[in-house]
Regions:
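A fold-level detector for beta-propeller and closely related beta-sheet-rich head/sensor domains
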Residues: 1-607
């Protein structure tokens, strides 16, 4: 079973002078469109030959799969046009919606002379989504029901195998799993956001407390020139997930999200702000601390969605691929930051809005407190990165790029949101579809990002040259269009070469004014960067992907870059330590050398 998202990590009590470490990993089972979460206790391993150096002890399969969350206390809530409802069953039928739903709400319609049972939505579909009974046997009974020789219901429903835990979670593909403040959260392509809470005793004792369905999210295929799914919503897509022959080929909730634990008015809150990914054109805001209240619908603060009718929230959103952010603004409020995303694969289309939307998490009306439109932006705004310049806990600046190849700085230093501004710090020609990383040097910031896209089939198959950039920013300077000679555009060019599966960088130094605006690394044909880099001290770890086998496979490399000049790592650079016995890694860093005596700065992985 493949793991398609990185594990969650958290620390427990201190024992023998060291904090206990734990993780939660996801295994996904494509044949049943389901996932399982496994909880691990991570142990340190000492290296007697290298005092003070620790690594993680190996985990056996039984160690990895020894503990799972429990699912017996699940509550499910759904947002529809007339509000948020808890899906409660009386007998085996949903109750308490007070006439606010019908078959049409969930895309159950008549076809020709066939008229499905008018109560299918509450007798079959919603009970299927909440997994209320001990098994799915009742749906086998529903599948056999007939009325005058015709099926009673619009489709046959999928029966999930409880012994294989297929009923607990849908397939988790692009969404992360994150642990903060005693909560564990993820989202899945069953159309739900899943919230777990820690219990007493074992630090791995988590139980599913709430599943949230942002049912009003609008959908339409991004990579499709037809009107497929036009005017459809996530609520109407639930029946597709439940259909008997379904195998996971649709998106539910698969965007990134962020958790933030804060104290307001003497009370703890754990805010969650998440994007829909390709599951819809919008985002959702939750307060996880409300899961144990008498009213679980209070967990949902607000949803924001693309609004063609210029309604209350008045925003234009594409598919919100990537990760939104949460930060404290200069007016003292905790706010959620959402990029406008991508409405269509055609970059120059006016359907793509390029803007940054900001929402007050302490006021749940879902109306943005700021809409920062990007003049001349194209292709939609990608995920932002927030910066606290003086480390006082307040956000001063945000950076984000667009698919036309520009990188922008958003000035958020005013207490008044209507005074927030945006300007480009870099103009290129290649699409930027991931958030930048920031490295702080003595007198300036380095904004580090890569170019490339895998949003559409054409993107995946493209072999267009892409780049990694490090742009110097001191809050005032701006660069023009880059000249790839390494001098004309003020960027120092480092060269990337490959020997077998190992990548090598040059370490050219700045001279004659070259590199006064930053640095650039040109990638090989087909390579691209679609993931935010990770910065540790002065090292940027950049994930490079290249698709193969007609887009069905990929080679993935992790490249370590010196953030000061874009060159190879120095002896003092941060780098991963991987055990010699790890044969899954082609080459790794530090002490290893090639046959020609070259020091390997960091290795590559292929999956």
């Amino acid at each position: 079973s493949p793991a398609l998202t990185a594990p969650a990590l958290w620390f427990g009590p201190v024992q023998n002078g060291k904090a206990e470490m734990y993780s939660a990993s996801v295994s996904t089972y494509p044949d049943s469109s389901s996932s399982r979460i496994f909880l691990q206790n991570l142990k340190r391993k000492n290296d007697p030959n290298k005092p003070g150096r620790y690594s993680l002890a190996d985990l056996s399969a039984s160690d990895i799969q020894s503990k799972e969350p429990t699912f017996t206390s699940r509550q499910t809530v759904i947002r529809l046009d007339k509000g948020v409802h808890q899906i409660k069953l009386q007998g085996n039928e949903v109750t308490g919606f007070n006439g606010n739903s019908n078959n049409a709400t969930f895309g159950i319609v008549s076809e020709g002379s066939f008229m499905p049972d008018a109560s299918e939505w509450k007798k079959v579909l919603l009970p299927w989504t909440v997994r209320a009974s001990n098994d799915d046997g009742q749906f086998n009974t529903f599948n056999k029901k007939e009325n005058n020789g015709k099926p009673t219901y619009s489709q046959k429903y999928r029966s999930r195998d409880n012994s294989k835990r297929e009923r607990d979670l849908g397939d988790i593909v692009n969404s992360p799993i994150v642990a903060v403040g005693g909560y564990l959260a993820t989202s899945a392509n069953d159309g739900m956001v899943h919230i777990f809470k820690k219990g007493n005793g074992d630090a791995r004792n988590y139980s599913l407390k709430l599943s949230y369905i942002p049912g009003t999210m609008p959908r339409q295929y991004f990579d499709n020139d037809t009107s497929a799914l036009k005017d459809s919503t996530l609520a109407q897509e639930l029946r597709t997930f439940a259909e008997k022959g379904y195998v996971g080929d649709r998106y539910g909730v698969d965007g990134g999200f962020v958790l933030r634990e804060v104290e307001r008015g003497g009370k703890k809150h754990v805010f969650m702000f998440g994007a829909m990914g390709f599951g819809g054109r919008g985002a959702y805001a939750l307060d996880l601390t409300k899961v144990d209240s008498n009213n679980p619908t209070a967990v949902s603060l607000f949803d924001v969605k693309n609004d063609n009718n210029n309604g209350n929230n008045g925003v234009k959103l594409g598919y919100t691929v990537g990760t939104p952010q949460i930060g404290k603004t200069h007016n003292g409020k905790y706010a959620a930051f959402l990029a406008s995303g991508y409405a269509t694969k055609t970059i120059d289309s006016t359907d793509n809005k390029t803007a940054l939307y900001v929402y007050d998490l302490e006021n749940n009306n879902g109306t943005p407190i700021a809409t920062i439109n990007v003049p001349d932006g194209k292709g939609g705004l990608s995920s932002p990165t927030l910066v606290d310049k003086d480390l006082d806990g307040t956000i001063d600046i945000a950076y984000a790029g667009d698919r036309s190849g520009k990188m922008y700085r958003f000035d958020l230093s005013s207490q008044s949101p209507d005074q927030w501004t945006v300007r480009p710090i870099f103009e290129g020609t290649k699409p930027i579809t991931s958030a930048p990383a920031i490295s702080q040097l003595k007198d300036k910031r380095v904004v580090i990002f890569g170019t490339g896209s895998d949003l559409s089939e054409e993107d995946v198959l493209s072999t267009s040259e892409q780049y990694i950039y490090g742009i110097f920013d001191d809050d005032t300077a701006t660069t023009g269009t880059v000249n790839f000679t390494g001098t004309g555009g003020g960027l120092l060019e480092q060269h990337l070469t490959q020997e077998d599966k190992t990548l090598f960088l040059t370490d050219y130094k700045r001279s004659d004014g070259s590199g006064n605006k930053g640095w650039v690394v040109k990638l090989k044909d087909g390579q691209r960067v679609t993931v935010k880099p990770t910065v540790v001290l002065r090292t940027a770890f950049v994930t490079i992907r290249k698709y193969k086998d007609n887009g069905c496979g990929a080679e993935t490399a992790i490249l370590g870059i010196n953030t000061a000049d874009g060159g190879k790592l120095t002896k003092k650079s941060a780098r991963p330590i991987v055990p010699e016995a790890n044969t899954k890694v082609a080459q790794y860093s530090g002490h290893k050398k090639t046959s020609s005596g070259k020091s390997i700065p960091i290795g590559c992985m292929e999956k």
